[in-house]
Amino acid sequence: MPIFQREGHLKYSFAAGEYQAGNYDSASPRFGQLDLIYGLPWGMTAYGGVLISNNYNAFTLGIGKNFGYIGAISIDVTQAKSELNNDRDSQGQSYRFLYSKSFESGTDFRLAGYRYSTSGFYTFQEATDVRSDADSDYNRYHKRSEIQGNLTQQLGAYGSVYLNLTQQDYWNDAGKQNTVSAGYNGRIGKVSYSIAYSWNKSPEWDESDRLWSFNISVPLGRAWSNYRVTTDQDGRTNQQVGVSGTLLEDRNLSYSVQEGYASNGVGNSGNANVGYQGGSGNVNVGYSYGKDYRQLNYSVRGGVIVHSEGVTLSQPLGETMTLISVPGARNARVVNNGGVQVDWMGNAIVPYAMPYRENEISLRSDSLGDDVDVENAFQKVVPTRGAIVRARFDTRVGYRVLMTLLRSAGSPVPFGATATLITDKQNEVSSIVGEEGQLYISGMPEEGRVLIKWGNDASQQCVAPYKLSLELKQGGIIPVSANCQ
């Protein structure tokens, strides 16, 4: 896709580390990378970046624009200097062109063309591999140009079809790498299925590779059953069947079981995985086996944010997040965020949020507990990309009380009188008296005094001391009678 950013906004990313190449005997150089994208007026975007390593340096400059009806385009150039084997230096440029267009008919077209203008240009990966082994295929298949085309057509209720084309050629080999893939995705009721075909011709092989596949998924309540079969040009077949789904009220416990069989002596294979999303992180355990192996794997992943109100553990963090604060509501859960719950300090992290859009954060009322009331059970935030925004929920921590208030003469306190808990705390607990002196009020301590006022004169106010009997609690509400004096 072409590269774009909203006008006046800057997006940046920085990475540093040690590069691990796919070739097992390749070097592992350390590197640093910085990328910048800035939104210009008139629907244009400027972007660039730099990558620095001991034996490789490159920088990129580019510009993009959305032309509306015509489509979106971005163009960039990369200048790179590589130190290869035997201290041999190589310099070159790479030019890239990206185009995308969506039509009202439901057609999406994308074209991405890459051309390396000189044979001296190497990507960071290519330079690392060639430096490790000058006689390897990494040097032989040094890309000169590549062109990609993607076409998708929506068919409404009948699904969609797609066609992908890719061609690469090389500086040190006359052959070309050609890849074609096409397929259809459809649905009958809740059952989804797909049919696909792919063809690949590599310059290092005389024959092409062809693969046909069929996949179908059937819903089973909170689980899915899946079947997939593939066949290549030599008649070799691979079949897989499996079941996956979720458990628990928040659907934060996931599982999958899969069994497969391949022809030509490969035999059976299978795997089973269980994953749990908790408030402080994710845990995954899995087992897999095949003809010549058995493997057990496990992982623990999470995030941590240090902020003005403490330290909060979370699930793995996304680019844009929401830090919610719900004082006193430990273990309260967030709607549509499996496993996210408030910790003992009253904080929680919603690890993913949509930038530049209104995100609604809601608490599950059934997870708040009888001693917590929230003034507004949902908040709305509009974060910028890469930001951590805070959503605060005002809470009342205490008992929910249905109080019957009687004056000294035995008559009920007047309808519409204000009732306020007498306390030295900053948060005010108040409510309005209903008919027959009935008062519902939350956030109340086990014992205290309530100031009742229905006017400004001393004769139009009184104080009602009370003490709750916790054993009388019914449905989370404690009834109590109090004399207002």
Swiss-Prot record:
Induction info reads: Induced during the exponential growth phase.
- Chief place of localization: membrane
Q: Name one Pfam family in it.
A: Usher
For the biological process aspect of GO, one term held by this record is: pilus assembly
UniProt subcellular location: Cell outer membrane
**Can you list the GO cellular component terms from the UniProt entry?**
cell outer membrane
UniProt entry keywords in alphabetical sequence: Cell outer membrane, Fimbrium biogenesis, Membrane, Transmembrane, Transport
What does the function comment of this entry state?
A: Part of the lpfABCC'DE fimbrial operon. LP fimbriae may participate in the interaction with eukaryotic cells by assisting in microcolony formation. Could be involved in the export and assembly of the fimbrial subunits across the outer membrane.
Protein name, entry field: Probable outer membrane usher protein LpfC'
**Name of the encoding gene:** lpfC'
